[in-house]
A protein has these predicted regions:
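Hydrophobic transmembrane alpha-helices and their immediate loop junctions
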Residues: 1-352
Length: 352
């Protein structure tokens, strides 16, 4: 039986030879017996965006296994990262090496404070002004502030603000914040001057990307919730180390007690519905399209500083401090916790 001619467009790469097997039944169309894929048809198997090529190894030609190259693996194809732009990675959600180093320094300062090594370094009978405990408190507060902002950023990302992926806020790197003054400098100044915790406004969140009121409110409340959890963990550690009926002047324990106090004040103060605080964003979630919301957000930094200035007044600060200490007395079994936290305040403000 003569071999039928293939279509003119097709290029036969492994067409059957002229000899037919003896078992081939007469009258059967040879095309029905031809193995699938025997014809190299670029217009059927190749990429429509690539010209057909009859040369060996040309575009659209199958490899040794008969498979064509995956279009997604080719540089410049649709779906591939733009030239010069970093590809999305799981590393976008891992803590940065800077944060790991920060944790290590905090732990080392805590160990030195626990051992009170500065007393061993000083000459016998000499007066000692401890400098490692205030460093421990500062490092611990930077870590606490980074966790506060991370909670905002993670909630915002999950709620729809994908622009935060890979940012310093999600990777817990406070030294690379876009709003470093509001996220790093101001909280450190608030703690150093007032010995209580406050954070800057979450101005890095793109609230327009978050679709619903409930999600926007959840993003705003994520930061205070994280600070509240940190305060509870630190208070629990202090309670375990100093059981009821005992007291201590250990520098590391006093630093943890003060950090617990600072995180609790940060959680409570941030609930105030004032521009620059998280409570305002809860209020703005219900009136997202109101004309006064963008103007208030543009001046959020001034609102945060104004709240700190009011709380810094001696009479107001005394009321706030007594309120927070009263909450600790209600929850914790050891009534000496406020005294331990106050000792941490004395260690922090060594210049006073």
């Amino acid at each position: 039986m003569p071999t039928p001619e293939p279509p003119q467009k097709a290029e036969t790469t492994d067409a059957p030879g002229p000899d037919r097997g003896a078992d081939e039944a007469p009258g059967v169309d040879p095309w029905d017996r031809m193995p699938e894929g025997a014809l190299n048809r670029p217009d059927l198997d190749g990429d429509d965006d690539e010209p057909a090529s009859s040369g060996e190894g040309g575009a659209g030609a199958p490899g040794p296994g008969g498979d064509t190259a995956d279009a997604e693996d080719s540089p410049g194809d649709d779906g591939a990262p733009a030239e010069g732009a970093p590809a999305p990675s799981r590393l976008d959600f891992l803590p940065s090496p800077v944060f790991v180093l920060l944790l290590g320094l905090t732990g080392f300062a805590g160990w030195l404070s626990w051992r009170a090594v500065e007393l061993d370094w000083a000459a016998e009978g000499a007066s000692v002004t401890p400098l490692i405990p205030p460093l421990l408190i500062l490092l611990g507060w930077i870590v606490s502030s980074a966790v506060h902002e991370f909670a905002h950023a993670l909630a915002a990302y999950l709620a729809g603000d994908r622009s935060l992926r890979g940012s310093a806020y999600l990777r817990l790197n406070p030294f690379a914040y876009e709003q470093a003054f509001a996220g790093l400098v101001l909280p450190s100044l608030y703690l150093g001057l007032g010995a209580f915790g406050m954070t800057g406004p979450p101005s890095y969140v793109d609230w327009d990307r978050i679709p619903s009121r409930g999600r926007r409110a959840a993003v705003a409340l994520a930061g205070p919730l994280a600070s509240l959890l940190l305060s509870a963990v630190l208070a629990a550690v202090v309670t375990v180390l100093v059981p009821p009926g005992n007291d201590t002047t250990n520098w590391a324990i006093a630093a943890m007690a003060l950090l617990s106090f600072a995180n609790l004040t940060a959680a409570l103060v941030n609930l105030l519905p004032v521009p620059g605080l998280d409570g305002f964003e809860v209020l703005a979630a219900a009136a997202h399209r109101a004309p006064w919301v963008p103007a208030a957000r543009r001046n959020a930094l001034f609102g945060s500083v104004a709240v700190f200035a009011v709380l810094w007044f001696p009479g107001v600060r005394e009321v706030v401090v007594n309120l927070v200490y009263g909450l600790f007395d209600l929850v914790l079994p050891n009534p000496v916790f406020p005294g331990i936290a106050f000792y941490g305040e004395l260690l922090l403000q060594f210049w006073a």
